[in-house]
Structures are given as structure tokens and as C-alpha cells.
């Protein structure tokens, strides 16, 4: 089971990148106890103090989900393992149709959310995987697009093959190759079911990895407080405004570090627990 080490973590995310900002900035933990204060050292040349990025550590698991605005359909559900010491994010996709006995119901993850909301979805995900979920974050379609627009309105993804889909609620046409998809197209990318559930989850996992890798930037770290205030109103989470605290140091470390590993999908809950 992936647990918090020393009771502290710093995690700034986007859903699709969004949770990186919210979860880290509102964790309610004391950042200084976890990573210490930035040290100062002399350069030896100018004699001016130079800020040394502190070490960050801790592990946690987060549930990320996205669904329809009417709350009837769960488009995406995933567990994200955050390892701050390794500066890595591991993603395990959950099947919304997976049947789980949680609480008083034995129904699919999607039904757990529809009937019991995000809190019951979190409980069901824990029962399904055996992994403790430290925080959850859910966004509906409208919030998903708003958050991505706030964070730059685009992710670079590799489209593996041509997509030419015309459905009742949306149309998605993409040529193969690497390209930037805006917020509207990314939502269609998440919802598109072509190729079956496995192909859909492959696309969703690629988007989540891209969000973690592309949206933790120095500019976003600099504007984190303003971004947080916009984003927090667009999501459903077990994080409250009272949790909000300035964890800018950890975001700066992730944004400036040259040691970050590329985010990766794992094939099983057991693999996520080992990360």
C-alpha cells in the first residue's frame, strides 16, 4: 500500500495536470517539516547568497476522475502515485465499469459515483485496488475545460492513428502524429471510446502523463496562488479552502529540478503500490 512517509508531502497537480496545483497547495501538511527551508550558500565568486533547492520527499496516492456534467457518466478514473523523493508520478487507470463491493452496494465504479458521489467513489477505488487513497479530485466536463484553459489550454500528445469520429454529442477528427490539443479537443479525447476500453484508457493515460510532465512549469509556480483560486472552484474534492497554505517551495523544486522523471502508466495496482 502506498502510504505517506513522515506524514508529509508536497504535490502540485493539474487534472490532466490540474491536481498538481490543488493537492499540493491544500494538503494541510507543514511543508517546512517535510523539506526544510531553502539553504543559502556563497557562490565563491561574487559572495552573494545563492538559493539551493531543498530536497523533497514523501509518497501519496490520489484518485483523479472526470465525468459528465449531469453526473451520470464517469469518463475517466485513475490512481496517481506521487513519489516526491524520486520526483515521479505513476498512473494506474481504473475501469469505470469494474464491479466493486463497497459500503452498502455491489455495483460498478460509475454507479458508486452516481449514487454516492466522490466520497463513495474513493471508497470503491480503495476496495477495488487495496490501495489507500489519500485525496480525491473530481471534475465534470465544464470544469475540466476551464482548468485546462486556465493552465494554458493545450497539451502536446502523440495521436497514434487517424481519428474520424462523428457522434451524437461531439465530433473528433485528428490526423496521426504529435500535435497540441486544446481543452475542448482534450475532453473529446477523454470521452472518445473508439477501439474499446483499453484503447480509451491508453489515450487517457497519455494525456495524464503529458499533463504532469508539461504543466509543472516555472511560470505556473510563479502564478500558483492566482491559479489555485481559479481552479479550486471547478472541482469536487475532499480538500477544503481551510487546508490552503503556501507550498510554493515544493512547486519551485519540481518546476526547476532537472531530476524529474517522465510520468508513466503502470499496468496493475500491485505495480502502483510498489512505486
Residue locations for each model-derived region?
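Non-catalytic, solvent-exposed segments at the cell envelope interface
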Residues: 2-275
Amino acid at each position: 500500500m502506498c502510504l505517506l512517509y513522515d506524514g508529509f508531502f508536497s504535490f502540485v497537480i493539474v487534472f490532466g495536470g490540474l491536481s498538481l496545483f490543488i493537492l499540493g497547495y491544500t494538503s494541510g501538511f507543514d511543508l517546512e517539516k517535510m523539506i526544510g527551508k531553502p539553504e543559502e550558500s556563497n557562490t565563491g565568486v561574487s559572495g552573494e547568497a545563492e538559493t539551493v533547492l531543498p530536497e523533497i520527499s514523501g509518497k501519496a496516492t490520489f484518485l483523479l476522475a472526470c465525468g459528465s456534467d449531469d453526473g451520470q457518466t464517469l469518463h475517466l478514473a485513475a490512481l496517481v502515485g506521487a513519489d516526491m523523493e524520486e520526483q515521479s508520478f505513476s498512473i494506474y487507470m481504473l475501469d469505470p465499469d469494474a464491479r466493486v463491493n463497497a459500503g452498502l452496494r455491489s455495483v460498478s465504479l460509475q454507479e458508486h459515483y452516481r449514487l454516492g458521489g466522490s466520497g463513495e467513489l474513493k471508497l470503491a477505488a480503495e476496495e477495488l485496488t487495496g490501495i489507500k487513497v489519500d485525496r480525491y479530485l473530481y471534475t465534470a466536463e465544464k470544469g475540466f475545460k476551464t482548468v485546462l484553459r486556465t493552465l494554458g489550454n493545450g497539451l502536446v500528445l502523440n495521436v497514434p492513428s487517424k481519428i474520424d469520429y462523428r457522434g451524437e454529442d461531439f465530433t473528433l477528427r485528428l490526423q496521426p502524429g504529435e500535435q497540441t490539443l486544446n481543452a475542448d479537443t482534450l475532453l473529446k479525447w477523454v470521452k472518445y471510446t473508439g477501439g474499446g476500453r483499453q484503447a480509451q484508457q491508453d489515450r487517457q493515460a497519455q494525456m495524464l502523463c503529458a499533463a504532469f510532465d508539461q504543466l509543472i512549469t516555472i511560470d505556473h509556480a510563479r502564478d500558483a496562488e492566482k491559479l489555485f483560486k481559479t481552479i479550486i472552484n471547478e472541482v469536487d474534492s475532499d480538500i477544503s479552502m481551510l487546508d490552503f497554505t503556501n507550498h510554493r517551495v515544493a512547486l519551485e523544486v519540481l518546476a526547476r529540478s532537472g531530476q524529474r522523471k517522465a510520468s508513466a502508466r503502470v499496468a496493475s495496482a500491485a505495480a502502483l503500490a510498489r512505486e
